[in-house]
């Protein structure tokens, strides 16, 4: 029966180690395993992505995304296995906005969830504006991010074609 207290002590120590590993540690200005820095990294990627979409900078979108990439909307689910296919879809989406006199998009709400050290999601609502300053489309989606080789990529979108609650 002396084994039971030893097992209990081992479990407590291991749980304590695991809990302590989620704390922010700063050594020489480097944040290790910080939820705040992970969320900031997602926010930066979202801003870069939004700016690239507005400016039709498809090479930047290519740099911010990774394949396979999945796009889910109300009508279909599409998986892109090559960057060429993915960028062609982004061009199709972006170019179709020209007839609406698209100017820019603004994020109206954002909720970022870090699932683990590699995967994060962002539930985002946005408005698309025309050059006159009017909103011609409101949308909402969940964007999927994965970290690979210490770099974050957009790997998928679940998109509502209207601003319906997700």
Predicted segments with their positions:
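Bacterial Sec-dependent N-terminal signal peptides
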Residues: 1-26
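Short, low-complexity N-terminal intrinsically disordered segments enriched in polar/charged residues
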Residues: 17-59, 63
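Short beta-strand edge/turn micro-motifs at domain boundaries
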Residues: 18-27, 136-166
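Hydrophobic pocket/interface hotspot
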Residues: 49, 61-62, 69, 86, ...
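A mature extracytoplasmic/lumenal domain signature
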Residues: 65, 75-76, 124-128, 158-159
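Surface-exposed, charged secondary-structure patches
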Residues: 87-132
């Amino acid at each position: 029966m002396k084994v039971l207290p030893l097992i209990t002590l081992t479990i407590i120590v291991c749980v304590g180690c695991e809990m302590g590993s989620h704390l922010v540690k700063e050594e020489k200005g480097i944040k290790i395993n910080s939820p705040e820095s992970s969320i900031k990294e997602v926010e930066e990627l979202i801003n870069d992505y939004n700016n690239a979409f507005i400016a039709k900078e498809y090479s930047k979108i290519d740099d911010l995304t990774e394949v396979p990439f999945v796009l889910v909307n109300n009508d279909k689910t599409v998986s892109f296995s090559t960057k060429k296919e993915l960028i062609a879809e982004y061009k199709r989406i972006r170019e179709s906005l020209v007839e609406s006199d698209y100017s820019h998009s603004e994020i109206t709400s954002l909720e970022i969830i870090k699932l683990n050290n590699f995967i994060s999601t962002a539930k985002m609502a946005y408005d698309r504006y025309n050059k006159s300053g009017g909103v011609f489309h409101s949308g909402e989606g969940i964007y999927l991010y994965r970290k690979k080789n210490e770099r974050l990529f957009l790997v998928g979108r679940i998109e509502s074609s209207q601003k319906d609650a997700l």
